[in-house]
């Protein structure tokens, strides 16, 4: 249909194009109704490459040039190499021969069953050293069309005029010092201000079908990432949420940012055609600002499945663990008996080789420094003990090591400031029939990194949850038997013991199975999720007192806002009822509740660290009353405004009621004659004051019975 036909059809239907906002039109995922989008324009060239039919063919160059007598021997060597990397089709290897000299030309074509096998063979064999003089150069057959179309004369790129972008930190300058949160329900993704003064969220941005799976904030809150079948996209701003960059990675399933937001890692897995084979995994690392792909990694899910809490198709996520701090200098991958640490300057291995650590099963970076902790379980049937070690990067020097005996399992927990490392150690009893738990506590910032051993009062108690106080020196442990475990608080330094761990208190028989510290410390929520149906206890650890107890029935998620002033509890669509979220104050006062059908996700927008020095923050804390007067006055104004709004609302309701009563009386009067005719002329609409009420009393004798009582 041409433009003229469209205009004619619109005129016939009475549609005024000037009144139509095309930016507000959103189509369901995968449906374009024949309208080409800007995404299709970007990926059109790439899509056409997959339709050539030669995607399963590779070209291997730098082969030896041999005569006819050695042809079969060379062909056998090449087949032996590439049969390990994929299935070569029958007659799928062709080695051209010079018709005059009868010598091979030094290259060959190999056709595999699938494009995936061809791509894998290219990745694995490019640079393969057959001997000193012959190092393979491998390309996809389809690449030659692209290379042949390169113009011989270089044309300088056209300079684009500079267009200043939006201030991506503008949302931090909100006059009311509010925080933003994003929610997903049904097809909609919505961003709100958390406006507790108004007892309701203030809408910022809403878009249906904004993402095809989930959304995720970057660690410092600058970007919001969405996932699509073509790849990932990041958006930014305080309220506009304009698209800043796209990252091409077909059917992306997971993303992860580096701590300083410089890099974005995307993940895609593909199920194999043969159920016995492992899934194929492709991971790409992009520069967030430029969109340039810095490195990609490909392989089977088995190669990416060691360590970590789990992911998609058997691969652990995140596959790459980023070193602490905002420099984004190093990231590591755990493989079988190997730890590969890469530097982002060249995106290659440090010292061009991986660290060999036999039987290593878990690694964890310090949140602030380039220190890597690792856990190696027992080997040789217990003859070789388990160990936890701290390794400095990039020097790979071992800073500290602790051997552990009779170990069943270990979990490592870094404190947010990188000052402490807690290692929960599950050990076998002497009979090997059960386990008990304890902690190895590393003081990272102290000389020689001293280690303390902590055992619970009842070492047979099962440890249900552990959590460090953010930016603090305390930690909490839930331990004991369900449904009423105990909660204990410990401190790494007290006024009496600055260098030893001390127990502060134990709370007996609590309905809790999860711990949620405030981001600023001091306050913690003892939460009973899942089987406990959303029991909440807001606890002040400084005073060791409960501030409030509450319940959010069937709550599945709890998340503090980045300032520690408010906390959100949510019931997601895993439950069919009561979907939505509730906002609470830090001390357990419910502020407002929002119900949303098919509610999937809630995430607060993170804030970057404060630019104020510790001394300046301490100074502000001392003079807080001076600053608080302004906000107290604003709160009072808002309270008066809300009261006035409530009065206006009640007044409007009263006027509406009185209007309805007058309408009813008017209608009643109009129908008076009709009612009188229906009652044969009897006038029944008589006011109450025309009647006289009399009170009449009467007695009715029902029965009489006589009894003779004898005196004793």
From Swiss-Prot:
Residues 56-143 form the RRM domain. Keywords: Acetylation, Cytoplasm, Initiation factor, Protein biosynthesis, RNA-binding. One of its GO terms (molecular function) is translation initiation factor binding. The keyword Metal-binding does not apply. GO terms for cellular component: eukaryotic 43S preinitiation complex; eukaryotic 48S preinitiation complex; eukaryotic translation initiation factor 3 complex. It is found in: Cytoplasm. One of its GO terms (biological process) is formation of cytoplasmic translation initiation complex. It comes from the Eukaryota. The keyword Protein biosynthesis applies. Belongs to the eIF-3 subunit B family. RNA-binding component of the eukaryotic translation initiation factor 3 (eIF-3) complex, which is involved in protein synthesis of a specialized repertoire of mRNAs and, together with other initiation factors, stimulates binding of mRNA and methionyl-tRNAi to the 40S ribosome. The eIF-3 complex specifically targets and initiates translation of a subset of mRNAs involved in cell proliferation. Component of the eukaryotic translation initiation factor 3 (eIF-3) complex, which is composed of at least 13 different subunits. Binds to the translation initiation factor TIF3H1. PANTHER family: EUKARYOTIC TRANSLATION INITIATION FACTOR 3 EIF3 -RELATED, EUKARYOTIC TRANSLATION INITIATION FACTOR 3 SUBUNIT B. This is Eukaryotic translation initiation factor 3 subunit B. It comes from Arabidopsis thaliana.
